């Protein structure tokens, strides 16, 4: 039986693109919108799409030649005016040809074209584009978001910095070129568990040029800092899930330095890394056509009447009907066997744990040394303060600038054995931690151990001594994301955690409300 042939239409933001996919890519035609000055204006981008749509579609259909079996289009997320042009074009064409219509999630399409090209079965995916920066993995029918930007997408941060210095759009490739002649200067490095924030980094980069630092040095340091943040959270997802494949997708992923850094991280961990070629990295019709094809084969078409665009369509809202595997993940009840986490190696003796923070080959040495020393000191201070506050934590035996010797805890790591009892226990412990004026910073189930009928916390490298509500909310957000991405009953576990948290901490309700606000920030921006 011949392969189905699907026409895909991409039009979420800056590029109007159409492609036909069968067994392989048949053809791809694009007409990108380039603003004369500044960034992308949604109305002007939509006007551009409307003016080029007929020509782009005609070229794709003429080159494809044979009959089209379905029309797929990017239904969201994206800029509303641009999405509506693509959707109207797709509906009209589907009706004219008498073929099914398929609404494709733009972010998931980036993931699927990456899986198709690399042949990786179940990877962790770093998706870095203008408006989106996410770390994703598949579990039980959905792409789960392990971490994402809490303010601005990486590509938009690069573009805004470039525009502030009168560089043309898009700014990323120009920054990449200028960075090749630069040297490292310190800029803010903001990782919150597996989440990221780029606005402070962007502002600091602007200030650095204003005080006389060269553009080459600032571009180099902006890239090195932002990319190291992305690679770190990707490694955290690898370490937490036990997966062994990484794919880089999205327009920013075309950057050679980001690819080099991810490849180095994976080499050090014994994981595999690949990125699709440049033609599949930025927004393109091929990814919509391919994802539309596998959705068609799974029966996931959409009636015309229900094909309303969704500018805020999240990756984790998509029912992935075309994948029949559950997604590889650590099995419940499995014992901890790994002696290397995302940041450190762990050596066990009869009574002690020796935690050694490892140099990262993907980070520039100056940044790497700074983070290792800073996080080792922060961890030792936080554990000692938490213990004084009555929080269940291991006893510190000795500390150097890169190593901590602490009490060995015999018990189960919660990521393998999480249940309602343990979730409530985690809530009690975190409530005590916040009451003591400490936030953890990396509150995942990898960093919780059930020991002596209580939940103990470990790995305080991202901790803060603070009573501010924002970092407390981030703690809860990181944990809730972890539960959503790695458990089958996250709502039940979150409810149990909240019960324990409220019992231990009088300000719990305010923090829970802040966590919800933080959750709403992690959207298409």
Swiss-Prot record:
The keyword Nucleotide-binding applies. It catalyses: L-seryl-[protein] + ATP = O-phospho-L-seryl-[protein] + ADP + H(+); L-threonyl-[protein] + ATP = O-phospho-L-threonyl-[protein] + ADP + H(+); L-threonylcarbamoyladenylate + adenosine(37) in tRNA = N(6)-L-threonylcarbamoyladenosine(37) in tRNA + AMP + H(+). GO terms for biological process: tRNA threonylcarbamoyladenosine modification. This is Probable bifunctional tRNA threonylcarbamoyladenosine biosynthesis protein. It is an enzyme of class 2 (transferase). It comes from the Archaea. Residues 1-322 are annotated as: Kae1. Pfam families: RIO1 (PF01163), TsaD (PF00814). GO terms for cellular component: cytoplasm; EKC/KEOPS complex. The keyword Lipid metabolism does not apply. Component of the KEOPS complex that consists of Kae1, Bud32, Cgi121 and Pcc1; the whole complex dimerizes. One of its GO terms (molecular function) is iron ion binding. The active site is at 442 (proton acceptor). Binds 1 Fe(2+) ion per subunit. Keywords: Acyltransferase, ATP-binding, Cytoplasm, Iron, Kinase, Metal-binding, Multifunctional enzyme, Nucleotide-binding, Serine/threonine-protein kinase, Transferase, tRNA processing. Fe cation binds at residues 106, 110, 127, 283. In the N-terminal section; belongs to the KAE1 / TsaD family. In the C-terminal section; belongs to the protein kinase superfamily. Tyr protein kinase family. BUD32 subfamily.
